[in-house]
Amino acid sequence: MNRHHDPNPFDEDEEIVNPFSKGGGRVPAASRPVEYGQSLDATVDIPLDNMNDSSQKQRKLADWEAELRKKEMDIKRREEAIAKFGVQIDDKNWPPFFPIIHHDIAKEIPVHAQKLQYLAFASWLGIVLCLVFNVIATMVCWIKGGGVKIFFLATIYALIGCPLSYVLWYRPLYRAMRTDSALKFGWFFFTYLIHIGFCIVAAIAPPIFFHGKSLTGVLAAIDVISDSLLAGIFYFIGFGLFCLESLLSLWVLQKIYLYFRGNK
């Protein structure tokens, strides 16, 4: 009968491991503690790219958080304005180099009405151009001996006419196109007829209105060119601009009236 092999305690060839002895157990080399003065063969490398990426991500997160906070404050401001006054506040975005008004035809005007709105916008820019050039022409006439009073009157026309035309007829048309409001369309037609009448009078420039030479109409141009050729040329250019603005305004009025009748 075979017996299981029992270790011989008196056998010197076998190594006895006493678990209770100090340091008696075999410890793998990888898990042994590093003694004082012992050098490490392996070094830990931390790539700089990862550090740069993490800093960039932190900056992006900070920028994103700031932008979200700004939008949240803007939305809160609008909600407070609507709740208090019932009026929606639009961000100023035009002109791009110095925003003073909100203007976004592509996003706020229906697609089928955008062409008409662009035509009306061209008409408004046209009257601004006419009034600004009118100031330049009267300044040339003043330099050539025409008197300073006509220059000051032309400056007043420009300072009042440019914002007034926007408030009285262009902005109401813009809102009428957005909301399809018959009341706003009616106000636009009334004020736009006054605008057309002013353009026609300015193109003629009778001496009984606006102190004669303060507008670059045809009668004023004929009178000025006899005294100064250069000033007369400027006046005739201004006369042509007022004529083009009058024709464009009549065309815009016809187009918008047909659009209004077609929608109603």
From Swiss-Prot:
Localization per Swiss-Prot or TrEMBL: Cell membrane; Cytoplasmic vesicle, Secretory vesicle membrane
The protein's role, per its UniProt record: Probably involved in membrane trafficking.
Record protein name field: Secretory carrier-associated membrane protein 4
Keyword list, A-Z: Cell membrane, Coiled coil, Cytoplasmic vesicle, Membrane, Transmembrane, Transmembrane helix, Transport
GO cellular component: Golgi apparatus; mitochondrion; nucleus; plasma membrane; transport vesicle membrane
Family annotation (Pfam families): SCAMP
Family, per entry: Belongs to the SCAMP family.
Cytoplasmic side, ranges: 1-122, 254-264
One biological process term in Gene Ontology: protein transport
Membrane-topology descriptor: Multi-pass membrane protein
Transmembrane region(s): 123-143, 150-170, 185-205, 233-253
Coiled coil: 51-85
Keyword ATP-binding: no
Region (Disordered) residue spans: 1-33
